[in-house]
Amino acid sequence: MQIYKVGGAVRDRLLGRPVTDIDWVVVGASSDEMLARGYRPVGADFPVFLHPQSGEEYALARTERKSGRGYGGFTFHASPEVTLEEDLTRRDLTINAMAEDEQGRVIDPYGGQADLEARLLRHVSPAFAEDPLRVLRVARFAARYAGLGFRVAAETLALMRQLAESGELQALTPERSWKEISRALMEPNPEVFIQVLHDCGALAELIPEVEALFGVPQPAAHHPEIDTGVHVLSVLQQCARHRQPLSVRWACLLHDLGKGLTSEADWPRHIAHEARGVPLIDAVNQRFRVPRECQELARLVGEYHTHAHRALELRPNTLLELLQSFDVYRRPQRFEEFVAASEMDARGRLGLEQRDYPQAAYLLGAAQAARAVSVKPLVEKGLKGAELGEALKRARLAALKAYKEERGKA
């Protein structure tokens, strides 16, 4: 029985990065032997055990064989006869197919160390093309390690393109796809994730609404980068630089979907693209069963982001309607995230990344002014029901008028 550290822990140590999770593989042991040593079984599909002291996962060495569609269409075989090399060959990338023995020696049968040096994300074997989830995983690793100079090997990108064309991506469950997408959007370079999916044809299969933005021009005066797809990539880059949460990053990815529906005859203008985009945003949200808070923010950002850009010009009653659309009185954080997403949109433009965005402070100040209006005096006057609601609305409108006048003087 031999125990090896495998996968990400070995990779990240060699890269000089912090090692968080450690996975272990056990060669030459059976399930009965693991149980006899006090390990607790947790694997439903194949033998995985928790260490009795550390709680870390130990998996019996196994092989896998394609037996159906999708990432779940595999038959696994675990036995004491399975070698370490056989276990490593089923892994996706060479940099993830290394092991370390108990003396700290690296076992690297597929050239993972050489690919680390060359900064290449390369598949281990042609079996890579059997698992559609690997398309998303490789794109996610590209987003994680882009800052270190990593790129997807040409032959691996070709296999990813083959998978995209095969229709296998459609076999991925919404939950599994969302798990990979959401993790990738939180990587240091989320725009690289989308770019890689675009380059291999997978974006057209998974989120065709975003794919449709590439090649769609915008007015150069407002968008020096011109291409809407490139703009979305730039906005995601700004999200990462400003450490925005997942909800903001997801909203930014989808905020301009309506531009993909603009007739070529109307290019480069995109009048009413906000409203046109809302049904598309809803469709993408439903496709991946996105968490509610991400769904709601994406929809609102898509519909109202140009309101944010014109915030200083909005009349008090329009500003009040905007605040009410976000239920800013009960959910102030959602409005703050909307403002953040709008600012990322404004900064995600070639050469304008550092420009001021006074609309952010103005909108947050307006929300504060409206929320400062107390309902208590109105209740004490005996107002209730619809009458109370109208009085409260008038009071908030007055507060916003005063706020706008005061800001105008400043």
UniProtKB/Swiss-Prot annotation:
PROSITE patterns: HD. Its cofactor is Mg(2+); Ni(2+). The keyword Hydrolase applies. It holds the Pfam family PolyA_pol_RNAbd. InterPro entries: CCA_bact (IPR012006), HD/PDEase_dom (IPR003607), HD_domain (IPR006674), NT_sf (IPR043519), PolA_pol_head_dom (IPR002646), PolyA_RNA-bd (IPR032828), tRNA_CCA-adding_enzyme (IPR050124). ATP binds at residues 8, 11, 91, 137, 140. GO terms for biological process: RNA repair; tRNA 3'-terminal CCA addition; tRNA surveillance. Mg(2+) binds at residues 21, 23. Magnesium is required for nucleotidyltransferase activity. Nickel for phosphatase activity. Keywords: ATP-binding, Hydrolase, Magnesium, Metal-binding, Multifunctional enzyme, Nickel, Nucleotide-binding, Nucleotidyltransferase, RNA repair, RNA-binding, Transferase, tRNA processing. GO terms for molecular function: ATP binding; CCA tRNA nucleotidyltransferase activity; CCACCA tRNA nucleotidyltransferase activity; cyclic-nucleotide phosphodiesterase activity; magnesium ion binding; phosphatase activity; tRNA binding. CTP binds at residues 8, 11, 91, 137, 140. CDD domains: HDc (cd00077), NT_ClassII-CCAase (cd05398). Belongs to the tRNA nucleotidyltransferase/poly(A) polymerase family. Bacterial CCA-adding enzyme type 1 subfamily. Comprises two domains: an N-terminal domain containing the nucleotidyltransferase activity and a C-terminal HD domain associated with both phosphodiesterase and phosphatase activities. Catalyzes the addition and repair of the essential 3'-terminal CCA sequence in tRNAs without using a nucleic acid template. Adds these three nucleotides in the order of C, C, and A to the tRNA nucleotide-73, using CTP and ATP as substrates and producing inorganic pyrophosphate. tRNA 3'-terminal CCA addition is required both for tRNA processing and repair. Also involved in tRNA surveillance by mediating tandem CCA addition to generate a CCACCA at the 3' terminus of unstable tRNAs. While stable tRNAs receive only 3'-terminal CCA, unstable tRNAs are marked with CCACCA and rapidly degraded. Monomer. Can also form homodimers and oligomers. This is Multifunctional CCA protein. The lineage of its organism: Bacteria, Pseudomonadati, Pseudomonadota, Gammaproteobacteria, Pseudomonadales.
